């Protein structure tokens, strides 16, 4: 999702999903959930999508994100799943 104003974002994600089947597509972005959905609310209609939200904030403690299964660099970062089916 960099840059956020990409007009072909939905097409790009759909193409990635077609190539990744049956797996989930994970998008890492430094934007907030509100910023992403304000510009690209249509992504909510896609299936098997995971988005990691939140900017890196230096000098903050890391934390484990159970959706991604990794430590994220600052506590304001998190992942959210959208329309998960039987993806691997």
Question: Residue locations for each model-derived region?
Answer:
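A generic structural signal for alpha->beta connector loops
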Residues: 22-24, 47-48, 76
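Charged phosphate-binding loop/patch that engages nucleotide di/tri-phosphates or the phosphate backbone
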Residues: 78-88
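Short internal beta-strands
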Residues: 27-28, 52
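Structural recognition of alpha->loop->beta junctions
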Residues: 38-60
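C-terminal helical cap(s) of enzyme catalytic domains, especially alpha/beta-barrels
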Residues: 72-78
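Conserved Radical SAM active-site core
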Residues: 1-27, 33-40
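Short, well-ordered, mixed-charge alpha-helical segments that flank or form enzyme active sites
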Residues: 34-36, 59-62, 88
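Conserved glycine-rich "GG(E/T)P / GGGxP" loop and the immediately following alpha-helix
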Residues: 1-16, 53-72, 83
